[in-house]
Amino acid sequence: MSTLKVDNLLLQNNNAGTGRILEVVSGVCDGRSITTMSGTYSLENVTAVQLLNTTYTAVTGSSITYTPPEGTKTVIYEFWSQIGAEDGADSICHSILYIDDVEVVSSRHAPSAYRAMNQTFKWPIQCNASADNTDVGSFTSWTSSKTLKIMARSYSTGYDQRYHNTRYWNGSGNTTQVTRPVLTITAIG
């Protein structure tokens, strides 16, 4: 049996074929930098629990400025985080994907956590659409940097939510245990 080990495999014609993963940017939001074919990307450093109130604010760790490689037809944005209730047993929030400070209306989510739960916010962004449609996150082309992030708020004062917090850890409740989020961008040709 033979083994081939390479650092990077690039097809001769990287624009041919469809449905291929062209690159993946993925990491724990601890301030790391990730280098790919299309550039070097820095993830935010999440070191604290984030308490939401009733005003929309950027979710820490969710922001990335990204340019997909040539030949990309779809970019998949994926943000994994831990959410939980601030005071009572229940929490509800509203979260939305923004691209260059424009709301992707169809991406609206309203996750609710009883005490605490994992949340994955995942959204495909079309890069070769026949027309731009920011309501669903599609563009005729994507050749320069765009900033992607999640904006969120609590449903109301009685349902405040915390991001990046386990709520319970090692037999005790209402902890300040920080769970760092994971951000993943996948470019598909």
Task: Label every PLM stretch briefly.
Residues 2-43:
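Glycine-rich, low-complexity segments
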Residues 36, 40-51, 55-62, 67-189:
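Terminal beta-strand-rich extracellular "head" domains
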